[in-house]
Design a protein with these regions (language model features):
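NTP/phosphate- and nucleic-acid-binding module
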Residues: 1-567
């Protein structure tokens, strides 16, 4: 077992033993892709959520709001979004034992080649050419086919009321866009954020907490005018990004570009300024989770790897034990895909109107229909034909003029009934469908990353060097001699004051002081206060720092203020 695998096993053992996480339904043998969060894991995840909200919502209150939408949505929502058709992975079945594998992962594991994004027939060809067999029994593999990852259910007792568990929070934000836009006084840019549960029926979830069938997603759908020239305030998060471009990847190169976000836009590396901006926010957020800059990389997805809705996607990768580089967030430029599709499927207007700073005169093409000539051709059918013709666009009429005629509702209409005129008009505003960029994070995966970066072994003891903001418990309070009632009384008073102040705090009087320090070091408590005999003389207590083990003395009535100032 290599060092990184050994570290990972130790983290998993610690997580189960001390109450961070463990496989769900263990007493029945577990269920792949599902994990429970214990008392410490729940607190750690909540602190990650709060930090994410701070970066992506509360620091952007002038343009980002928080909403909540259901986990279940009717089938039409996911038909419109493209998930019913496109949210699939390739699978292959053994013709002998019947075992099913995710085809691209199988080939990557056996052949060591990257095949993500290849079509089923291309994967089948590789299986045949390389003679890949079933790893379990050696049997022949069938042709590769697609498997939809949506969890299907029914709403109420009727089987025809098909619905799905959402695989992303995004669609609830898209379908609610006009409501939120109106509530926020028709302002763009507008970010709609959501934190909630999602489900993906993964074929063969692996890598523990890295790939789950149910997890908490944290997303922003950021709506903006694609013609708006106003720049994001890049100075708020000015650090450089490490980017591996799709161009480099397509050439088999691993040369990383280090560039400021605004420079990445200017040089055409990132297609949209808001995409670059939210990538810079994501980098700052990741560093506060305990990651170094050299451990963070934005990898641009190749065209065949991108989701059906994306014009450009970057995965934010971080390096962790055993699994190497793993994705902690995805950053997609979804353009107007989602709003356009929901507009098409629902019939609701998803456009917005913006007044121009200065009205301008424009020349537009307009279709004119010669109604008198139309009557000569169609007589009493003229109203019906006219109604159909009025639905034609300028582009469609231009095509008719070049072809000579068109058949509409069964009537052959000659081109001579049309003409196109240019008219001048004063435009005071424009109507358009907003574009969207999306930063999206998985909370449980972040939890694993945070534990991986915080885990240290020092002098035979385990220390979780969690950032104090993220630590499940901020403070531990110990009476040095538990049997001494006066020490216990002061320690309990400090404990209760800490609870009243909103701190998560542990009170422990079991065992030696060394054992108590070791127990709280192992779960990442950053500060420990010990009440000793000197405390009774001068009203001071010892504060011990988890990472350095250094100790200082402060007044007992200043403990709460001191802890709050050092988080």
């Amino acid at each position: 077992m290599d060092v990184s695998s050994d570290k990972y096993e130790k983290i998993v053992d610690l997580a189960a033993r001390r109450g961070f996480f463990w496989p769900s339904y263990e007493i029945y043998g577990g269920l792949a892709g599902f994990y429970d969060l214990g008392p410490l894991g729940s607190l750690l995840k909540e602190n990650i959520r709060k930090l994410w909200l701070d970066y992506f919502v509360f620091r952007h209150q002038d343009m980002v709001v928080l909403i909540e939408t259901p986990v279940i949505a009717p089938e039409i929502v996911f038909k419109a979004s493209g998930h019913v058709e496109s949210f699939t992975d390739p699978i292959v079945t053994c013709s002998k034992c019947g075992k099913i594998y995710r085809a691209d992962h199988l080939l990557e594991d056996i052949l060591g080649i990257k095949v993500e994004g290849l079509r089923p027939e291309e994967l089948t060809s590789i299986i045949r050419e390389k003679g890949v067999k079933c790893p379990s029994c050696g049997g022949e593999l069938e042709d590769v086919r697609t498997f939809n990852l949506l969890f299907q259910t029914n709403v109420g007792p009727y089987k025809h009321d098909v619905a799905y568990l959402r695989p992303e929070a995004a669609q609830g934000m898209f379908t609610s866009f006009k409501r939120v836009f109106n509530a926020m006084r028709y302002s763009l840019p507008l970010g709609i954020a959501q934190v909630g549960r999602v489900a993906r029926n993964e074929i063969s979830p692996r890598q523990g907490m890295v790939r789950l069938r149910e997890f908490t997603i944290m997303e922003v759908e950021f709506f903006f005018d694609p013609e708006d020239t106003e720049e994001p305030d890049f100075s708020r998060f000015p650090e450089k990004l490490r980017i591996l471009t799709a161009d480099a990847r397509s050439k088999g190169l691993d040369e990383v570009v280090v560039v400021r976000p605004e420079e990445a836009v200017a040089e055409g590396i990132v297609l949209n300024k808001w995409l670059a901006y939210w990538m810079s926010v994501a980098q700052a957020f990741a560093k506060e989770l305990g990651l170094r800059e050299d451990e963070i990389l934005f990898e641009e997805k190749l065209p065949e790897e991108r989701a059906h809705y994306s014009k450009q996607t970057f995965d934010q990768l971080v390096s962790i034990s055993r699994w190497g580089w793993v994705e902690i967030s995805g950053h997609a430029y979804r353009t107007d895909y989602d709003l356009s599709r929901h507009m098409q499927f629902s019939g609701e207007d998803m456009t917005v109107y913006r007044e121009l700073k200065k009205p301008k005169e424009v020349t537009k093409k307009s279709v004119v229909i010669d109604q008198e000539l139309l009557k000569e051709y169609f007589g009493s059918d003229t109203p019906r034909v006219l109604q159909a013709l009025r639905r034609l666009s300028v582009e469609e009429v231009e095509k008719i003029l070049s072809e000579g005629e068109v058949i509409v509702d069964g009537f052959k209409v000659p081109a001579r009934v049309f003409r196109i005129e240019e008219v001048k008009e004063v435009v005071r505003g424009r109507r358009f469908i907003p574009h969207v960029v999306e930063p999206s994070f998985g909370a449980e995966r972040l939890l694993l990353v945070v534990l991986d970066k915080a885990y240290y072994e020092e002098g035979g003891r385990v220390v979780l060097k969690l950032p104090p903001k993220l630590a499940p418990y901020k403070l531990a309070v110990f009476p040095l001699i538990p049997k001494e009632e006066s020490l216990r009384t002061l320690a309990r008073r400090i404990y209760h004051d800490a609870v009243k102040a909103g701190l998560t705090v542990i009170y422990d009087e079991d065992g030696s002081i060394g054992r108590r320090y070791a127990r709280v070091d192992e779960i990442g408590v950053p500060f420990a206060v010990t009440v000793d005999y000197q405390s009774l003389e001068d009203n001071t207590v010892t504060v011990r720092f988890r990472d350095s083990r250094e100790q200082i003395r402060i007044k007992s009535d200043e403990v709460i203020k001191w802890v709050l100032n050092n988080l």
